[in-house]
Amino acid sequence: MKLHEYQARDLLARFGIPVTGGGVAVTPVEARTIAAEIGGPVVVKAQVHVGGRGKAGGVKLAQTPTEAEQVARQILGMNIKGLTVEKVLVAEAVSYKRELYLSAILDRGSKRVMMIASAEGGVEIEEVAKTNPDAIIKIPAHPTMGLLDFQARELAFRIGLNDGKQARQFAQIASALYRAFVECDASLVEINPLVVKADGSLLALDSKILLDESALFRHPDLAALHDPSAEPEAERRAREAGITYIKLDGNIGCMVNGAGLAMATMDVIKLSGGEPANFLDIGGGAGKEKVKAALQIILSDPNVKAVLFNIFGGITRVDEVARGIIAALEEVPTDVPMVARLVGTNEEAGRALLAESKLIPAATLAEGAQKAVAAARGEL
């Protein structure tokens, strides 16, 4: 589960990490009030779960409370990558000398919490990994004792914080970040940038936190932070229908039963020269209504040029899936070509149901992927 920036900021503050002052506004007048309380220049930031807010005009500087009100009026209601801005964070504008990066993430290779730091903050860490990988410092926390003091100090020294006072403060922040990661059952806690102010002190200027949804039952206070309005409409509908759906950037929609088979399907589409438009797992035992909902979600993406059904009927009955596809197509007529690879329980009945439809049959996954790629290109 993603947290908004203001929620992440407040959570880090609970662990003793220095953060910017400010507050959240849902109206321009509230933004003006918060700016007046700060008493200086402020940054008004759109609170939506997407990157690229600044480039989209969702982050603006305001010198006065009146200007903060004007800026908030411009940002509130703005559409950024399909999400409507309903809240803005009004935070104090801070001058600084350096931008650093610090995060904690679960490293599945070492099966430990990996602490990552870099002297090149303020930009996407993935970009730093491409352009200057040596600037990224990684240290795994001890599996039972956590992040040790000497490890935190080593991170500080290796990113150029040679001043003793700065190194100690960085070590304290790194240790607090690790505690936040573990105690909140997070999958990512990131400060980017962690800035060095003019007086030499450190401050978390922007932050990102991802929580493990499977562990939220242990944290009702964190679960309460979930904002349904901040997630894309398709993902919200999928969650309500009990479907696992993640939108991607391709043009071939996928409906698969089982997460492993869904990932394999995406891989084969890529190997066939195509790009998957989504990850979608309808789960085991999916009935007609669930299949219908899944297809409607896939077709709601205007980028989808073809759909590939890859169903292996173990618990899931192939004829039930076929009925769901037919029912969905009756309610949502579409010209999008569809390829179906249906095998397993009641597959003969399922294929018979689809025989009179316009679906393109495929005997194997490889054949299905190749036909879906060709259909997306308009070659079928």
UniProtKB/Swiss-Prot annotation:
Pathway assigned to this chain's UniProt record: Carbohydrate metabolism; tricarboxylic acid cycle; succinate from succinyl-CoA (ligase route): step 1/1
Coiled-coil regions listed: none
Recorded GO CC terms: cytosol; succinate-CoA ligase complex
Ligand binding (ATP): K45, G52, R53, G54, V94, E99
Residues that coordinate or bind Mg(2+): N192, D206
Tree of life domain: Bacteria
EC number(s) per entry: 6.2.1.5
Protein's UniProt keywords contain Signal: no
GO molecular function ontology, one term from the record: succinate-CoA ligase (ADP-forming) activity
Keywords: ATP-binding, Ligase, Magnesium, Metal-binding, Nucleotide-binding, Tricarboxylic acid cycle
InterPro entries in UniProt: ATP-grasp, ATP-grasp_succ-CoA_synth-type, ATP_grasp_subdomain_1, Succ-CoA_synthase_bsu_CS, SUCC_ACL_C, Succ_CoA_ligase-like_bsu, Succinyl-CoA_synth-like
HAMAP family: Succ_CoA_beta
Protein's name according to its UniProt entry: Succinate--CoA ligase [ADP-forming] subunit beta
Organism: Chloroflexus aurantiacus (strain ATCC 29366 / DSM 635 / J-10-fl)
Gene (name only): sucC
